[in-house]
């Protein structure tokens, strides 16, 4: 299996031929190379990913990320197995409370998150959570109601959170251009003040444009 990739066909250097297509051999040697293209989420499909021996979901497509988003477990663990493409389709935030998400050095591309009060790849963190080794590239994150808390990675935090080796870029804006955002940040939209919780951010950066009022 080539994680996150779809087989397109065979190329002779000038033309790509689909699997099973007829080909007339010329009077010379020809070298063919397999052509693979990145899998892109269709905006609808959710597919259950496999779990490894330690109980981590192994996510290799946008459809598997969509399934992970829709699970109800509060003790989730997941790893990205490859770069994944979200196709620019609207994606509701992941609504898990906490646990562990390891990007394993991979990138999420084409992410277009749309939500209401708390908006980001992760909607809100309310218990112990670790997010690490993840890049989100050129995301668009939109809030659809007044008073929203918006970040590319996490919308709102009211639990203990560690974020390490995470890099995000993109745009934060209101869904219709008129909603008022309460708080926004490239990485995290808002962190609530509670004495028994801690938020640690290590070796991370954000390059975000924030639009709206």
Which residues does each predicted region cover?
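Surface-exposed interfaces of beta-sheet-rich extracellular modules
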Residues: 1-21
